[in-house]
């Protein structure tokens, strides 16, 4: 049986990490699968990993970006300098350990999941190894970032993109290289057996509590809505750097009995909340694909998102499987929420279409596309 290696920064919480685990679990039916992981953040992967998948940790170090910025903010010069030196040393170890793995692994296929891994794989990957880059992020009109991806992947065999628009964009950029661009969507690893009844007065959102996800915007929108619809609650599942700000906002606006911050939770917990909710809300400023969006749609939830989240534009057919709000128009966003709150039949109609739409992201379908390009090896 041939061997596939997937290069991963860590196996903690994150959309990329969730996708890595989903792919590894499916590939182990046809290949020996090893995840080469730079950082060991937890004792095991936070997402359930098939026992047949081997995990190899390349270093014993942990990232210290958070500590560095905290000391910098507090103007603690000595500790900032100490963490800075530690960080530089960590980057050196990360580079050498990853390159050493790429040069010495006996894998037939190596899949890179970060741009820096793409570069090292292109430079140091052995001849005869199938080299695949897997780009999850959107360039968001940042041509500097886009050009960096092009430079890093130009020596690879394939660049897998998670959206059609990204595939079209990078195909033009890489036209004079040997790297072929392929569109393969992220994987919906489980289709729930039952849809939500959509009868509970619960709004829900899942994601990292970081600025680009727009959760402060979501709370501001909900604060307005809750005055007219006081019996509707809001569940936010996830954690991150903005949590304290969200907690303060909830306290200041007396929303504690209506808004629940659940923190990081496992898939079973998230599925349970989604299946008891009636409307899914996304307020992200940027989103390459939106795994949580297809998970919500798989439960038959009508979804609302701002259209500047690129991934949402590819997943939501506005009016049929949810609503896309242009120009971050808060009033329009609120109106669509209220429309759905007022009309159970519309919720059911859109929810049914949503669930049908995401069947094409089922793992059994998506893995066929991966296996097709791997046949070269």
Please identify what each model-predicted range represents:
Residues 17-22, 201-230, 241-247, 331:
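A conserved mid-protein helix/loop that constitutes part of the nucleotide-sugar donor-binding site
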Residues 133-140, 154-192:
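Donor nucleotide-sugar binding/catalytic pocket of nucleotide-sugar-dependent glycosyltransferases
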Residues 231, 332, 339, 346-360, ...:
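A short, well-ordered alpha-helix in the C-terminal region of glycosyltransferases
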Residues 247-265:
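Nucleotide-activated donor-binding/catalytic signature segment of Leloir-type glycosyltransferases, i.e.
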Residues 264-265, 272-277, 370:
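Short alpha-helical donor nucleotide-sugar binding micro-motif in glycosyltransferases
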Residues 285:
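Aromatic "clamp/platform" in nucleotide-sugar-dependent glycosyltransferases that forms part
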Residues 302-306:
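Short hydrophobic beta-strand element within catalytic cores of glycosyltransferases
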Residues 317-319, 323-330, 339-344:
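Conserved acidic donor-binding segment of nucleotide-sugar-dependent glycosyltransferases
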